[in-house]
Amino acid sequence: YSSENNFYTAVKNEYPEFLEKNKIESSLNLFYVAAYLFGNDYRFSRPHIASQAFPDMELTNINIARFFVADRPELYYWELAQISQKAGWTNGTFTIILNAVEEDYIKVDLNRYIHKSLFSVAPDAIDSIRHQLEKLVGDSGYYGIFAIFNYDGFPLIDYEWNEHLLQSIIENYDLGFKLLEPTVKDRRYKKGIIVPQSNPCQSFEEFVIAQMKIDGITSIAKDAFSGYLRRKGLVLTATIPIELYDGDGLRLEGNNFVFG
């Protein structure tokens, strides 16, 4: 197996004259040249290259991820980062691979993953978690996962409570709740809004617009909007999520955010 980046680096080190003669200046160019020349001997699916001896699988990101982690019972972020560096994946490919890994694993904290087949929460604990979420969401109909600083009300389980574990449980168990997250994510912090599963909003932007409609707001100055989002408990910091600047329904016109 090789990524296109590692392949390009190897060719650049061993056969620089070949790249220069054929005016190949990027891993992308070389990938397609190699696919044309060696398509019968190797398998190519950007950014992955595999020999015929590589396990017989479609070269998708999820399959490549599963090959490298090999169903380990427990994974750490640093291990995945190490695999990525050795494989020569770009940051973008690593992010895609990381998301693929999370289809098979439960993220229990910032750096640790447990295979789904080995992770469980007792039914009575699930009921207790559901009850606690109902209390948090309360009359407002939502609660920012980033605003939970104390987990004393949550049941004692085999893992230490944190926002990553809570999000994993919400996403993998039938609690009657879902998370609406800003499009641009940061793996270090959770920015989602917990809402009942029955809430009609399908995106963070839709939910923000719904709150503005409730408050009778159709236009609001940029500086005031930042404060509004924080007062409503929709964000933790003063930074306005990027998708609100030019979304499907909400956008920045001049110095004002408007929708409709």
Enumerate the language-model features and the residues they cover.
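C-terminal non-catalytic scaffold/interaction domains in large multidomain proteins
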Residues: 1-260
